Amino acid sequence: MFRRPACLSALCRFLPAIGLLTQLAAVATAADPKQATNVKKEEVWQAVYMIGQRVGYSHTAIEPVTKDGKSLLRTSFVSQFSYKRLGQPLVIKQILNTEETVDGNLLRFYFEIANPPASSTFTTGVVDGDQLILKQTVDGKVKESRQAWRSDVKSPTFQERSLKDTPLKAGETRSFEAFLPEFNSVTKVKLEAFDLVETPFFDGKSQRLLKVKMTQSAVPGMIVTAFADPRGELLKVSNSLLGNEMIAYQVSKEEALKAIAGAELDLAVSTLVKVKPIPNAHSLRSMRYRVTTRGQQVMEVLAPSETQTIKKIGDEVAEVTVTAMPIPDKAAIRPVEAEFLASSQYLQSDDSKVKGLAMAAAGDTTNPAEIARRLERYLYEKLNKKNLSTAMASAAEVARTMEGDCTEHAILLAAMLRAKGIPSRVVVGFVYVDKLTAFGGHMWTEANLDGHWIPLDATLGRGGIGAGHLRMLASSLSDDGPGAVSCFAPLVVAQLQIEVLD
């Protein structure tokens, strides 16, 4: 019995992260140092809608400051989103503060995601010559890292100021590189202006505005469409998320802060991909699907593996064959990259509680295959308190609370496997939900046994999986990789149609 359908926890957290790309409002500031002394503190409010329902707001404020005799710009961005997941409320608040030169070069930032009851995560960054010093706090523990840095990398808010200071004209393009805190990486941003179009607003009114397409390399499949007035100010910004449209409108403070109505958007229901019934999907040894990825190259969305073969039919269409790979009776551990065994900020395999759970679950067996089987079953039985209000907790947090949904099952299982010396990673994709006859966003775990990546799903507890999972991306959740939530990017931007062939 599948007990936790349509897991969208970390996906819900990823939506505000996309807000850094789609909602940082157009604030009247100058990118020309000569104009910096004329810049006054300004602010912009936005109301955010998804599938026609208000889901949150954002506020951007910017002010000129003088520091050590230099003119700088200080920007503050705050957003708050409210959703429902199978009837339970989920609230996520995001804060981004940046300090940059008047021509947009990033100097320092503070980034926070708050999602009660889980602990907040914080990231700070300070440019020190040719290095960016990052400090990330997860579950109260700080991890410091460094990245090579170029002085011309822009702030996350620069694209809007660029349009305001020097508005694009139809047919013009502009490119630059900017840092995205949620991804802990630099992305190449491209702006492309089209013609004036009649643009409708939430209040029924419309304006003729310049259509501007924004793309960036961090999430290649995501296209943000902005609509600018003659001053270069973005009055409306939209993009497709989870197969639906998210729109941010520039509004008054009073409009932005209006209470969200009681019938908040239920993402777990609104983002399902309906298919014909698949009897006993999680017991089947093999299944064929035709997958269409609207607006994206299908081979950039789906990931081949030992359990999933992909036959390309067209640029956006593929035939996918999913074949079950059961846990073997016995297995040995083969050499793998260190990242699949290392403790990390989200997979704290060295945490005392995580190690204790792994020991209790494994018992006296030393056979890695049997350990994997027992750990999966243990979490299926013990981690049975639903908490759909948490977006993405670390393994150590889950080990303390023993509550959550598919994300928490996958992360804790991966950490427990590593605590027993078994290489692991998490997988993002879609899973078939029997009761809803639909596929929903999901996360599960893979263990490396005898050199093969064997799928495990602690929300099912069946000793492996059948043919009801569609795989998109796998991640070690290494501290050296992109931000943890970024692994959900392909799932969030995907616009899938799934046809059951067998």
Model-derived regions: residue spans:
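Bacterial N-terminal signal peptides
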Residues: C12-A25
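Cysteine-centered nucleophilic/redox motifs
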Residues: L375, M402-F430, T445-E446
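Acidic, serine/threonine-rich low-complexity disordered tracts
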Residues: A31-W149, K164-D329, G481, P490-V492, ...
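Short, well-structured beta-strand/strand-turn elements
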Residues: A218, S240, L388, K420-D434
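Sec/Tat signal peptide C-region and signal peptidase I cleavage site
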Residues: A26-A30
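Active-site rim recognition segments
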Residues: A248-A261, L265-L267, I333, E381, ...
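N-terminal secretory signal peptides that target proteins for export/translocation
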Residues: M1-C12
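Secondary-structure boundary elements
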Residues: P156-E160, A324-P326, A331-G404, L412, ...
